[in-house]
Amino acid sequence: MDKLADLNYTLSVITSMNDTLHSIIEDPGMAYFPYIASVLTVLFALHKASIPTMKIALKTSKCSYKVIKYCIVTIINTLLKLVGYKEQVTTKDEIEQQMDRIVKEMRRQLEMIDKLTTREIEQVELLKRIHDNLITRPVDVIDMSKEFNQKNIKTLDEWESRKNPYEPSEVTASM
């Protein structure tokens, strides 16, 4: 562990990588050298980051299989992103979590649809009752005795003095 985090060790690995590259590629005009160097740099960075992380994770974790699987999936996804793929590798656990989330959302939507359907049925029943109450039924004879405005009205013939009591008459005032 100390050897992996040692700066001298890191510099010696980089120096040995550079020496190896220069010995393999003798021609200085090689066009692919920057690409090869960047890929090797990324691989070295992954090596330096993943080995200590996995060692610490395996020591502290109770379930080493899941940790190794997660680390490998993360490394593969990183490499796929570097190459330019948009797809990602997923584990069974992630797929099951997504399926559970989808099923939970579908249940929630079905409950909401059920509530809305129940409310709509209640509204339709209420509208039917209102419609039934508003339907006018033809009546042969209208009983006007229950009308308040028509109770005490007498015609001119029915008045005793044959004079309309509601017509204004002359008013005399005392002085």
Swiss-Prot record:
Compartments (UniProt record): Host rough endoplasmic reticulum membrane; Host membrane, Host caveola; Secreted
One protein family per Pfam: Rota_NSP4
Keyword annotations from UniProtKB, A to Z: Activation of host autophagy by virus, Calcium, Enterotoxin, Glycoprotein, Host endoplasmic reticulum, Host membrane, Host-virus interaction, Ion channel, Ion transport, Membrane, Metal-binding, Secreted, Signal-anchor, Toxin, Transmembrane, Transmembrane helix, Transport, Viral ion channel, Virulence
Entries under SUPFAM superfamilies matching the protein: Rotavirus nonstructural proteins (SSF58030)
Record carries keyword Transmembrane helix: yes
Known partners and oligomeric status: Homotetramer. Interacts with the immature particle in the viroplasm. Interacts with host CAV1, early and late in infection. Interacts with host integrin ITGA1/ITGB1 heterodimer. Interacts with host integrin ITGA2/ITGB1 heterodimer. Interaction with microtubules blocks trafficking to the Golgi apparatus.
Comment on protein domains: Binds 1 calcium ion per tetramer.
Name used for this protein in its record: Non-structural glycoprotein 4
